[in-house]
Amino acid sequence: MKASYQNHDLEMFFSTNLAQVDGAVNAGIEAELNRQNQQIELIASENIVSKAVMQAQGTCLTNKYAEGYAGHRYYGGCEHVDEVEKIAIARAKQLFQCEYVNVQPHSGAQANGAVMLALLQPGDTILGMSLDAGGHLTHGARPALSGKWFDAVQYGVNKDTLEIDYNQVRELAIEHKPKMIIAGGSAIPRIINFAKFREIADEVGAFLMVDMAHIAGLIAAGEHPSPIPHAHVITTTTHKTLRGPRGGMILTNLEDINKKINSAVFPGLQGGPLMHVIAGKAVAFGEALEPDFKIYIKNVISNAKVLAEVLQNRGCDIVTNGTDTHLMLVDLRPKGLKGNAAENALERAGITCNKNGIPFDTEKPMVTSGIRLGTPAGTSRGFGNDEFKQIGEWIGDVLDGLAANPEDNSEVEKHVKQQVQKLCSRFPLYQ
């Protein structure tokens, strides 16, 4: 009887689906899918992956421990996951035209941390972009590890153009002699001059690290200059504009740096890689090598320009007066609004974005004077210029309504939400 019970139990273990095993978690997943279906996603760091990428992540590869690298694992039974990881690496090398790639970092932050572990010592000076100017926490912000372990100096933007102040970068580099200069960020709407950054880095003998997390898809599609010829090392996430699973990656053309990076990722910073996620990365890189991906990225940029233009026509102040990329920053001060209030109002109307600091912002990070908007997810869904024109008008309606009636903007929000849901019903996800 006991053996029979165990056999039945095992049969259930391998065959019972999530809804039957854990209704609470399944309900949360179903609710999130419903939210994604019914809301317009404008968070610039989010995107929508293909069904194939999701399927790759939900496979038996989640069972496999594979510490080390292909051909040099600390566990047996890795011959098949070795092949998957090698596919991911080969596709990434082809996509970005570089010599060496590490696809094991669990996130962009882990990738950045691994580079610093490989090339720096605690107490070394780093020069990165300040958060309020458009940088990222991992580029030397005080609350982050990079701001605690290193002497972090921050550059910003020109007060007139609100674009990267390369003169300031050079002046700070000459003054502080950083061991590493970091280019890239989380809210930069204009093209980055990587050649100029390398010129400055060479002048002071610094490593140049480029964090291309937000623009990796644009670079892969040839719609933004590549940092590969200029940077000593490049990091990225694999989601955002690359439209892959949530994860990180490190690239370089230099063999000596590659060896240090590999040692820093494992065993320096991580243990076993997430092989199911690496499988998803491989699938996404394969998708990005297809001609359709170039069309997709062109549409992302075109949609961003359309959205920025509509918002400007509605009286919004767009930082740098437009965008070259997938994202834009909206300065809400002329409308008398705060970023957190605008984010909440737009979400009530079915449009998700994030509050965001703007250059020289005096508000706290949980308040802010702006919002950040991006077009990757909407474009993945199938929205084109016409849809983004309408979305821009809806955003204008909500912001104007909030400015006129900050205590109760419910009528405007309710009306916009109804229209948003009608639009979303025409572009369903995962049907």
UniProtKB/Swiss-Prot annotation:
Gene3D superfamilies linked to this entry: Aspartate Aminotransferase, domain 1, Type I PLP-dependent aspartate aminotransferase-like (Major domain)
NCBIfam families: PRK00011.1
Primary role: Catalyzes the reversible interconversion of serine and glycine with tetrahydrofolate (THF) serving as the one-carbon carrier. This reaction serves as the major source of one-carbon groups required for the biosynthesis of purines, thymidylate, methionine, and other important biomolecules. Also exhibits THF-independent aldolase activity toward beta-hydroxyamino acids, producing glycine and aldehydes, via a retro-aldol mechanism.
GO molecular function annotation: glycine hydroxymethyltransferase activity; pyridoxal phosphate binding
Domain of life: Bacteria
Subcellular location per the Swiss-Prot or TrEMBL entry: Cytoplasm
An annotated GO cellular component: cytosol
One Pfam assignment: SHMT
Record key words, sorted: Amino-acid biosynthesis, Cytoplasm, One-carbon metabolism, Pyridoxal phosphate, Transferase
Site (Plays an important role in substrate specificity): H239
Disulfide feature: none
Keyword Cytoplasm attached: yes
Name assigned to this protein: Serine hydroxymethyltransferase 2
Pathway(s) annotated for this protein in UniProt: One-carbon metabolism; tetrahydrofolate interconversion; Amino-acid biosynthesis; glycine biosynthesis; glycine from L-serine: step 1/1
Protein family: Belongs to the SHMT family.
